[in-house]
Amino acid sequence: RLQILSHKKSRFVFMKRIEIIKKAFLVLLVLPFLNTGCKSSSEEDFPSYIDAKKLRIFAREEVSTSFLNNVGEAYEEMFNDNSNIDSTMRSRYLSTSQDEYVYQRVGVDGMANNSNFDSGEPPLPYHGNVTDYIWEKNSADDGQIGEVIEHLLHTVTNVVFYLAYPNDWDYNDSYSAISLAMHEAIDKGIYDVSSYDDLKDDNDLYNKITTQEYAYWLILAEWNYFGITDKSMDGMSGNEEFIIGTPEEIDAQLPLGHQLYKDYVEKVLSIPNKQKIVSLF
């Protein structure tokens, strides 16, 4: 059993390293356009798209129509009504997403492995307000639910929350709510950021990705979604990078993180119905 756990741990670390490289690569492709202006855009890069809750979701040519539509449905599942929703905050979130032309990209798994991969640029006015890709997997058993939920939440927190609530979601402000909550988890040994050490030479990129991943793990735990996304390791509610994975543990051990969730996430998003998500992917 120790050998099995060691193998799973090694595989988790290996897959995490690959994921970090992909994230950094995609972010670095976007940053020059933010600083110097957009390259010539073409609808050929993203020949199809859908709109879901004021978010435009662009797809590369290879993406299946059914998968693109299901990604949109998964996002809409996060916006069901419940008694915790603050209508003013949700309205601000949605209007920011629309007015700032936030978008999500969808591609096919393996595309970014090509050394000549071009992340593409959607038609104007969509430009810059984006984070990473959602990849359509070859098999539903290959972590597809986790892939979709993770990268939608990256867009929610790292792009829309950052734009709509800059004081609390500014990842470059060490005193912002997101930064303080993340460091609470790091200081308590709950969030291990050592796998991101290679990014430290670029402070903006390091802050962007570490807070993005923290917010994702936090929400995943608050939603009790570690199981459905296949992100928990044997003998743990969480995993090697984020060791707790239930709302009760977040409440008990990460008061700043739990408050951040209560103040923003819970007031804007609903927990997606698990049966619905499973039916989509």
Task: Please report, for each region that a protein language model flagged, where it lies by residue.
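Hydrophobic alpha-helical targeting segments used for export or membrane insertion
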Residues: 26-30
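Conserved aromatic-histidine-acidic binding/catalytic patches
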Residues: 59-63, 140-144, 200-212, 231, ...
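Post-HExxH zinc-binding segment in Zn-dependent metallohydrolases
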Residues: 160-231, 237-239
